[in-house]
From Swiss-Prot:
Keywords: Chaperone, Cytoplasm, Disulfide bond, Redox-active center, Zinc. The keyword Cytoplasm applies. GO terms for molecular function: protein folding chaperone; unfolded protein binding. It is found in: Cytoplasm. PANTHER family: 33 KDA CHAPERONIN (PTHR30111:SF1). GO terms for cellular component: cytoplasm. Disulfide bonds join 237-239, 271-274. This is 33 kDa chaperonin. HAMAP family: HslO (MF_00117). Belongs to the HSP33 family. InterPro entries: Heat_shock_Hsp33, Heat_shock_Hsp33_C, Heat_shock_Hsp33_N, Hsp33_helix_hairpin_bin_dom_sf. The lineage of its organism: Bacteria, Pseudomonadati, Pseudomonadota, Gammaproteobacteria, Pasteurellales. Under oxidizing conditions two disulfide bonds are formed involving the reactive cysteines. Under reducing conditions zinc is bound to the reactive cysteines and the protein is inactive. Redox regulated molecular chaperone. Protects both thermally unfolding and oxidatively damaged proteins from irreversible aggregation. Plays an important role in the bacterial defense system toward oxidative stress.
Length: 293
């Protein structure tokens, strides 16, 4: 059995790998503290926690395919009790997530019952250049299957996603793998099918509890796999007092004064993503107003 020191060395890491004799590329990611930090800010129902974990892993795997600096947003909108689930991640593997719930969500509620009539939207935003947005119908039982379909339709590349959420040693964990035929056309369907068949045998405890190198050896011990250095993954919200101040400046002085009157002379702004509070008293508000152009 792998000891704790061994398995934790790859907590909150993303790896890329290539098969030396088959034109297929792969990625592996595991979210431990990153996932826990996300869940600690809200009391989400269990089914929503699992969905966010699945979306976070998918977003990490998607951003790892970017060939440029930028970010990807994976967003679900619907008219069911889960109104919104949103994950944003960038090429530095900094990620954040949030959900909005309006209604009762049971532990084993299906994706379709949670969302109702809804869509999955993927937005790719390079730091330089135009944004790309794809809208995907939620016509599959899981987000993972919907995203596999997205890859086939948008990139015309055979892609396998394996994503699992759960607990390991009593703590929340989300992990996943991506296999994709190389875009240069050198890969064969037979090679891809062979590797995906092996990947499909992976067990939850292996994804959650093994270092990447050992996991890949167990799955592909007859293959030559080139494993590249890991990239750290972390929860990163990006909120700040400055951004909260800018948000306040978007409303009129009259509206600000009304809010101050209703809240006994101060405004408490809470970040929806990480839960951080930003307090503005009357003096700070007056100073802020004076900066208006």
């Amino acid at each position: 059995m792998t000891n704790q020191q061994d398995y934790t060395q790859d907590n909150d890491k993303l790896y890329r790998y290539l098969f030396q004799h088959r034109a297929v590329r792969g990625e592996w990611v595991r979210l431990n503290k990153t996932f826990t930090d996300t869940l600690n800010t809200h009391q989400y129902p269990k089914a929503v926690q699992d969905l966010l974990g699945e979306m976070m892993v998918a977003t990490n795997l998607l951003t790892a395919t970017l060939k440029f600096a930028g970010n990807i947003t994976v967003q679900i909108q619907g008219d069911g009790p889960l109104r919104l689930a949103l994950v944003n991640g960038n090429d530095q593997q900094q990620i954040r997530a949030l959900a909005r719930v309006d209604g009762n969500i049971t532990e084993n509620m299906s994706l379709h019952n949670m969302i109702g009539k809804g869509v999955l939207v993927i937005t790719i935003a390079p730091k330089e250049g135009e944004r790309y947005q794809g809208v995907i119908s939620l016509d599959k039982p899981t987000i993972t299957e919907c995203l596999e379909d997205y890859f086939v339709r948008s990139e015309q590349l055979q892609t396998q996603l394996i994503i699992r959420t759960g607990e390991y040693e009593g703590k929340p964990v989300a992990a996943g793998m991506l296999l994709q035929i190389m875009p240069d056309g050198s890969g064969t369907p037979e090679d891809f099918e062979h590797l995906t068949t092996l990947a499909a045998t992976v067990k939850d405890e292996e994804l959650f509890g093994l270092p990447a190198e050992e996991l890949l050896y167990r799955l592909y011990h007859e293959e030559t796999v080139n494993l590249y250095p890991a990239q750290d993954v972390q929860f990163f919200c990006g909120c700040s007092a400055e951004r909260s101040s800018s948000a306040l400046l978007l409303i009129s002085d009259e509206e600000i004064d009304e809010i101050l009157a209703e809240h006994k002379g101060s405004i408490d702004m809470q970040c929806e993503c990480c839960g951080t509070h930003y307090f503005f008293n009357k003096e700070a508000i007056e100073k802020l107003k004076s900066t208006r152009v």
